[in-house]
């Protein structure tokens, strides 16, 4: 039986990303990993990744810029948010897991298990 292949966007210094990656390996996933620090997502990549989804879900509410700009109260436009995320990869909620057109933001063991079935 072949291993499930996933695309994993992460920051190696992120504890949650490390836990998620270890969990994926335990589940037997074949991981293609992208370090968002070394290889940030371009505006067009973010637009493609977000697609029809709510762009606000991709914003990390823990990020300093998110709090400084009070994005919870005054969310940026989709275009502005995507430009900000492209220039500030830490503003992107992570990790991002992509498999067969399905996307998961953050780390949720049950959701990961379900996606890999």
Tell where the protein language model's regions lie, with residue ranges.
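Thiol/selenol-based redox catalytic cores and closely related redox-interacting motifs
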Residues: 36-117
């Amino acid at each position: 039986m072949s291993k499930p292949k996933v695309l994993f966007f992460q920051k190696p210094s992120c504890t949650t990303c490390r836990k998620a990656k270890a969990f994926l390996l335990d589940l037997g996933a074949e991981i293609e990993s992208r370090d968002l620090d070394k290889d940030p997502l371009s505006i067009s990549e973010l637009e493609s990744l977000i697609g029809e989804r709510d762009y606000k879900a991709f914003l990390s509410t823990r990020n300093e810029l998110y709090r400084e700009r009070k994005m919870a109260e005054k969310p940026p436009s989709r275009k502005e948010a995507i430009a900000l995320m492209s220039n500030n990869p830490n503003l992107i909620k992570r990790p991002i897991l992509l498999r067969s057109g399905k996307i998961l933001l953050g780390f949720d063991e049950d959701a990961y298990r379900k996606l890999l079935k």
